[in-house]
Amino acid sequence: ACVSDEKDELYFVAAVNADLDSGEVRVCAFDPNTSADISGNKDSLMGHYKTGGSKELKKAVDSLCGFTADKYAVSTANQFKNAINVLSGAQISVPERISYKTKELSLSLMPGNQTVKGETLLKYFRYCLTPSGGGAQKQGELLCVLFSQYINKTYLASGRNYFSQIIDSLDTDISIVDFSRCERTLSAMAAGDIKYTSVSSAGELTVTPGKRGK
């Protein structure tokens, strides 16, 4: 998830299921206003975050998904932007021209493939939640694009260096020990034919590809 630097707004929140047996990583992004019930306490995802921080947000997402996620990570806006810049930006494809300006958000992008820095990418994530932006599923698609770019042999060769520059600054329960345990899995993902899919509902996170939508 990513929150504003003031921690009063959720920019995006998503659950990820890496199903390597089926060769697919599925991502479900949620609108921050989505209601979640934690042991009878009903509130929006943003409300749960304001009440109990990252751990409460994780519980809220777990309740929506119907399973308990192994790990969580939450960044502030500046941490997200810095992470993308450390990784030399992100390559995105913009389907049509975007010219959007309000007091809260200003974004201008031309159509086509382009490499953007962290600030522009975060604005794009935020734009997705505007009426014309495509919604949370579009945010999920952007996350899939990022995963497919960054989980590769080039980045993994310097994985520990990137970990120390990025993960160590986040609000997360992912440790360097966890990263070490996952290095083989990440290498297998980088070497294999992994499909990254943005799904529209939490229930689809655990449904095998052949049965999805039935």
What are these regions (language model features)?
Residues 85-162, 170:
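Flexible, polar/acidic helix-loop-strand segments at domain edges
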Residues 8-13, 22-30, 56, 67, ...:
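Extracytoplasmic
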Residues 12, 54-62, 77-81, 85, ...:
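Extracytoplasmic/secreted envelope proteins and their assembly/folding machinery
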Residues 5-6, 18-22, 32-35, 77-80, ...:
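Solvent-exposed coil/turn segments that connect beta secondary-structure elements
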Residues 50-110, 173, 177:
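Amphipathic, coiled-coil-like alpha-helical scaffolding segments used for oligomerization/assembly
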Residues 3, 7, 22, 26, ...:
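C-terminal solvent-exposed extensions
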Residues 1, 12-17:
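Short beta-strand scaffold segments in enzyme catalytic cores
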Residues 43-51, 64-71, 126-134, 147-152, ...:
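Second-shell loop/turn segments in exported
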